[in-house]
Protein backbone atom coordinates (compact mmCIF):
# COMPACT_ATOMS: atom_id res chain seq x y z
CA UNK A 1 0.00 0.00 0.00
CA UNK A 2 1.22 3.49 -0.73
CA UNK A 3 1.92 6.16 1.80
CA UNK A 4 -1.03 8.25 0.61
CA UNK A 5 -3.36 5.29 1.09
CA UNK A 6 -2.16 4.77 4.67
CA UNK A 7 -2.67 8.44 5.48
CA UNK A 8 -6.20 8.34 4.09
CA UNK A 9 -7.01 5.23 6.16
CA UNK A 10 -5.51 6.81 9.32
CA UNK A 11 -7.50 10.02 8.83
CA UNK A 12 -10.75 8.09 8.23
CA UNK A 13 -10.16 6.02 11.39
CA UNK A 14 -9.31 9.15 13.42
CA UNK A 15 -12.42 11.02 12.22
CA UNK A 16 -14.56 7.95 12.98
CA UNK A 17 -13.14 7.72 16.51
CA UNK A 18 -13.72 11.42 17.13
CA UNK A 19 -17.28 11.09 15.83
CA UNK A 20 -17.91 8.13 18.14
CA UNK A 21 -16.50 10.02 21.12
CA UNK A 22 -18.73 13.03 20.37
CA UNK A 23 -21.77 10.75 20.05
CA UNK A 24 -21.02 8.99 23.36
CA UNK A 25 -20.53 12.35 25.10
CA UNK A 26 -23.79 13.79 23.76
CA UNK A 27 -25.72 10.69 24.83
CA UNK A 28 -24.15 10.52 28.28
CA UNK A 29 -24.21 14.25 29.13
CA UNK A 30 -27.09 14.72 31.53
CA UNK A 31 -29.00 17.97 31.88
CA UNK A 32 -28.86 19.77 35.20
CA UNK A 33 -31.34 18.55 37.81
CA UNK A 34 -32.61 21.17 40.24
CA UNK A 35 -35.46 21.99 42.57
CA UNK A 36 -36.65 25.38 43.79
CA UNK A 37 -39.34 26.15 46.35
CA UNK A 38 -40.09 29.86 46.19
CA UNK A 39 -42.44 32.36 47.77
CA UNK A 40 -43.45 35.93 47.11
CA UNK A 41 -45.97 38.43 48.41
CA UNK A 42 -47.94 39.74 45.47
CA UNK A 43 -48.01 43.48 44.94
CA UNK A 44 -49.05 45.39 41.86
CA UNK A 45 -48.35 49.14 41.87
CA UNK A 46 -51.19 49.79 39.41
CA UNK A 47 -53.78 47.80 41.34
CA UNK A 48 -52.51 48.79 44.78
CA UNK A 49 -54.23 47.11 47.70
CA UNK A 50 -56.33 44.64 45.66
CA UNK A 51 -53.43 42.32 44.83
CA UNK A 52 -51.54 42.69 48.11
CA UNK A 53 -54.03 40.37 49.83
CA UNK A 54 -52.39 37.34 48.21
CA UNK A 55 -49.11 35.51 48.19
CA UNK A 56 -47.56 33.10 45.75
CA UNK A 57 -45.68 29.84 46.17
CA UNK A 58 -43.77 28.54 43.16
CA UNK A 59 -42.31 25.05 42.99
CA UNK A 60 -39.95 24.28 40.11
CA UNK A 61 -38.53 20.80 39.61
CA UNK A 62 -36.28 19.75 36.75
CA UNK A 63 -35.08 16.20 36.27
CA UNK A 64 -33.48 14.66 33.20
CA UNK A 65 -34.35 17.66 31.02
CA UNK A 66 -38.04 17.75 31.96
CA UNK A 67 -39.53 20.56 34.05
CA UNK A 68 -42.61 20.94 36.25
CA UNK A 69 -43.66 24.38 37.52
CA UNK A 70 -46.49 24.88 40.01
CA UNK A 71 -47.77 28.37 40.79
CA UNK A 72 -49.96 28.25 43.92
CA UNK A 73 -51.84 31.35 45.03
CA UNK A 74 -53.22 31.91 48.53
CA UNK A 75 -55.02 34.67 50.37
CA UNK A 76 -53.67 35.91 53.71
CA UNK A 77 -55.92 33.47 55.59
CA UNK A 78 -54.29 30.53 53.78
CA UNK A 79 -57.20 29.75 51.45
CA UNK A 80 -56.30 28.67 47.93
CA UNK A 81 -56.87 31.41 45.36
CA UNK A 82 -55.93 29.14 42.45
CA UNK A 83 -53.12 27.08 40.95
CA UNK A 84 -51.43 26.97 37.58
CA UNK A 85 -49.39 23.84 36.84
CA UNK A 86 -47.10 23.80 33.81
CA UNK A 87 -44.91 21.07 32.37
CA UNK A 88 -42.31 21.07 29.63
CA UNK A 89 -38.61 20.67 29.01
CA UNK A 90 -35.46 22.58 29.83
CA UNK A 91 -34.15 24.02 26.56
CA UNK A 92 -31.00 25.68 27.80
CA UNK A 93 -29.01 26.21 30.97
CA UNK A 94 -26.68 29.23 30.99
CA UNK A 95 -24.44 28.60 34.00
CA UNK A 96 -22.59 31.92 33.70
CA UNK A 97 -25.77 34.01 33.84
CA UNK A 98 -27.48 31.44 36.11
CA UNK A 99 -30.44 31.31 33.75
CA UNK A 100 -32.72 28.43 32.80
CA UNK A 101 -34.82 28.52 29.62
CA UNK A 102 -37.90 26.28 29.80
CA UNK A 103 -40.35 25.41 27.01
CA UNK A 104 -43.76 24.75 28.58
CA UNK A 105 -46.01 22.47 26.52
CA UNK A 106 -48.90 21.74 28.90
CA UNK A 107 -50.81 23.79 31.43
CA UNK A 108 -53.55 23.03 33.92
CA UNK A 109 -55.44 25.63 35.93
CA UNK A 110 -57.55 25.26 39.06
CA UNK A 111 -59.59 28.16 40.36
CA UNK A 112 -59.65 28.79 44.11
CA UNK A 113 -62.74 29.07 46.27
CA UNK A 114 -65.99 30.00 44.57
CA UNK A 115 -66.60 33.73 44.58
CA UNK A 116 -63.02 34.50 45.62
CA UNK A 117 -61.22 37.16 43.59
CA UNK A 118 -58.25 35.83 41.60
CA UNK A 119 -54.94 37.68 41.95
CA UNK A 120 -53.91 39.87 39.01
CA UNK A 121 -50.73 37.80 38.69
CA UNK A 122 -52.82 34.64 38.22
CA UNK A 123 -54.95 36.35 35.57
CA UNK A 124 -51.88 37.64 33.70
CA UNK A 125 -49.97 34.34 33.80
CA UNK A 126 -53.07 32.43 32.71
CA UNK A 127 -53.69 34.86 29.85
CA UNK A 128 -50.14 35.12 28.47
CA UNK A 129 -49.35 31.41 28.72
CA UNK A 130 -52.72 30.55 27.15
CA UNK A 131 -52.00 32.79 24.16
CA UNK A 132 -48.56 31.24 23.59
CA UNK A 133 -49.77 27.65 24.04
CA UNK A 134 -52.73 28.15 21.68
CA UNK A 135 -50.69 29.99 19.04
CA UNK A 136 -47.32 28.18 19.12
CA UNK A 137 -47.97 25.04 21.16
CA UNK A 138 -45.42 26.18 23.72
CA UNK A 139 -44.89 28.91 26.28
CA UNK A 140 -41.32 30.09 26.91
CA UNK A 141 -40.38 30.65 30.51
CA UNK A 142 -37.05 31.78 31.91
CA UNK A 143 -35.77 31.56 35.44
CA UNK A 144 -32.74 33.61 36.47
CA UNK A 145 -30.95 33.47 39.80
CA UNK A 146 -30.34 37.11 40.73
CA UNK A 147 -28.63 36.52 44.06
CA UNK A 148 -27.51 33.38 45.83
CA UNK A 149 -26.25 32.40 49.28
CA UNK A 150 -25.11 28.77 49.34
CA UNK A 151 -24.34 28.88 53.07
CA UNK A 152 -28.00 29.65 53.84
CA UNK A 153 -29.33 27.58 50.89
CA UNK A 154 -31.23 30.64 49.67
CA UNK A 155 -31.62 32.43 46.36
CA UNK A 156 -33.50 35.36 44.89
CA UNK A 157 -34.95 34.33 41.55
CA UNK A 158 -36.63 36.19 38.67
CA UNK A 159 -39.35 34.40 36.69
CA UNK A 160 -40.13 35.74 33.19
CA UNK A 161 -42.42 36.60 31.43
CA UNK A 162 -44.46 37.05 34.62
CA UNK A 163 -41.81 39.44 35.98
CA UNK A 164 -41.97 37.82 39.42
CA UNK A 165 -39.14 38.01 41.95
CA UNK A 166 -39.24 35.28 44.59
CA UNK A 167 -37.17 34.14 47.52
CA UNK A 168 -36.28 30.45 47.16
Predicted regions span which residues?
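Generic short beta-strand segments
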Residues: 39-45, 70-74, 103-109
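Hydrophobic membrane-insertion alpha-helices, especially the h-region
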Residues: 3-26
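Non-cytosolic head/periplasmic domains of membrane-anchored proteins
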Residues: 94-168
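Charged, amphipathic alpha-helical segments
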Residues: 20-23, 52, 139
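Short, hydrophobic/aromatic-rich segments at coil-to-beta transitions
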Residues: 31-39, 64-69, 151-157
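Extracytoplasmic/periplasmic/luminal assembly and interaction segments
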Residues: 48-99
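Mature extracytoplasmic/luminal segments of secretory-pathway proteins
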Residues: 17, 35, 163-165
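Tryptophan-anchored aromatic micro-motifs
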Residues: 31-53
Amino acid sequence: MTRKGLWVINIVVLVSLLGCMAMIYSLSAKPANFMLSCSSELFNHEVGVADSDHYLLVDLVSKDGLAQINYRYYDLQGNSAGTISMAGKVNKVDTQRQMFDIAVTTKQENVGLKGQEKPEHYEYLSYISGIHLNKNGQHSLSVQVLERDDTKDYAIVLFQPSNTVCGC
